[in-house]
């Protein structure tokens, strides 16, 4: 893929991460970096954690929410690891900038993103599972009336958007990147996960509720 020519980025006048950052080496913001990327076991752990959480919701076992428990889903297929999404996520993680990148789409589909960072004055012991749970636990602020149509209120997206991307039924693929680095004497652990097809489509159904 020529990422610099991707129409889905151009439509938004956005530069693709792989076009903007051509070097696979961590960028100038990444001081004393380590733990770039994942072992195969860690990749499996990320996928398995996501699928465990998807199945928790799909089977009606998530009791939290502002308006009562989360209803079960007709279907919420398991996610599988996607190397292309992972390469793009890692390239962005390697910039050590805690924000969303401008464009991370692929030829196949639009791509969504969750990011998390933890800081520690000593050794950073936060696990990948801990960070995924930071996203998922937004379910406590999620109103189950939003399932049939994702709200277009940006404020809502800010508070529950990580959770909704995790349980978005039409998302099939995940690929993540990670780096640890130092920033102002803090030991940072930065995780970027890219999801395709992207979730959090305004007005779209998050998942079909099982009656």
UniProtKB/Swiss-Prot annotation:
Coiled coil: none annotated. It is found in: Secreted. The keyword Disulfide bond applies. It comes from the Eukaryota. Its main location: secreted. Residues 58-77 are annotated as: Disordered. Disulfide bonds join 4-19, 9-103, 30-96, 176-193. Pfam families: CAP. GO terms for cellular component: extracellular region. This is Venom allergen 3. It comes from Solenopsis richteri (Black imported fire ant).
């Amino acid at each position: 893929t020529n990422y610099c020519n991707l129409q889905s980025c151009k439509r938004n006048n956005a530069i693709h991460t792989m076009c903007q950052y051509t070097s696979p080496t961590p960028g100038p913001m990444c001081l004393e970096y380590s733990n770039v990327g994942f072992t195969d076991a860690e990749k499996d752990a990320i996928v398995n954690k996501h699928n465990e959480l998807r199945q928790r919701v799909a089977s009606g076992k998530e009791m939290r929410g502002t308006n009562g428990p989360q209803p079960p889903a007709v279907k919420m297929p398991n996610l599988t690891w996607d190397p292309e999404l992972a390469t793009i996520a890692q390239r962005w993680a390697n910039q050590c900038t805690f924000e969303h990148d401008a464009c991370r789409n692929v030829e196949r589909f639009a791509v969504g993103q969750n990011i998390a960072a933890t800081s520690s004055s000593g050794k950073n012991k936060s696990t990948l599972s801990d960070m995924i749970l930071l996203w998922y636990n937004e379910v406590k602020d999620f109103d189950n009336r939003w399932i049939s149509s994702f709200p277009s209120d940006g404020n809502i997206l800010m508070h529950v958007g990580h959770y909704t991307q995790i349980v978005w039924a039409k998302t099939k693929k995940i690929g993540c990147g990670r780096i640890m680095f130092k920033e102002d004497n803090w030991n940072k652990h930065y995780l970027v996960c890219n999801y395709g097809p992207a979730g959090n489509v305004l007005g779209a159904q998050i998942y079909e509720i099982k009656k």
